Amino acid sequence: MYTKADAAYIPFAWMNPELAVILPVYAGDHPDYLREALESIVRQSLQNFILVVVEDGPLPEAITQVLNEYKDEMQLLQHSQNQGLATALNTALDWCEQYKISFLARMDADDRMRPERLEMQLDFLNLHEEVDVVGCALEEMDTQGRPRGKQVFYPENHHECLRFFRFRDPLPHPGVMFRMRFFQKAGRYDPGLRYNQDTELWYRGFLNGAVFANLPAVLLEFRMTEAFFATRRAGKARARQLLALRKEINKGLGFGPEARLFARGMFLLALLPAGIRKLAYRIFR
């Protein structure tokens, strides 16, 4: 939970927004990528929203300068020390709940939104009252922001999202929009998890009756870097945590032997060199 000492407040009551975009930032982010992310947010076709940025610990001057360029566009919350992604997201959720925000869009500091993303997702949720969280398709881009020639689509309805979850996450975490009630059903992000916080959140969502959906439109430009392949589900600690989580998911949601076999395969893949993981990602993404 943040305190007034940890947060910089701006007056926004006149806006009366129902939607917030949540953007965590930490020292490891790239300032140029962050600028692109922020620019894509402020240029949305839908303008009645508030941007909530969480500074997760001390930041380099280059990142601070980028944030200062957009200081009039955001609500800034600050952690005096780095506390991790889950805690940063929970800080934003607590603030949004306090100010009775109804819808929350996720965004990462190295990706870009298509201009129509917020408008399309909010329109969808307003038309489908039963849905608690909606994702979208994404297009991969390289470190220079150029298309890599690959688009990724996710299941559109709840039933197919649940089936898809036997093997992979059914939504792109930086491309989702939640109703606040999703977190009333599923709870907050687990700060005790160093990895796979989104996977664990989806599990609790399914377990507690949240309804999932995806739009078949490319609304997120997802940046692929060598660091992404080097760290994605890599290392023994991450592999063990993922395997344990997948075992819990398979048991809790009643997934069959094919899901258990896939979980073991993911565990072994995480122990292989980055080059092999990169090849597997390109094949199975």
What are these regions (language model features)?
Residues 230-285:
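Non-catalytic, C-terminal membrane-associated alpha-helical segments of glycosyltransferases
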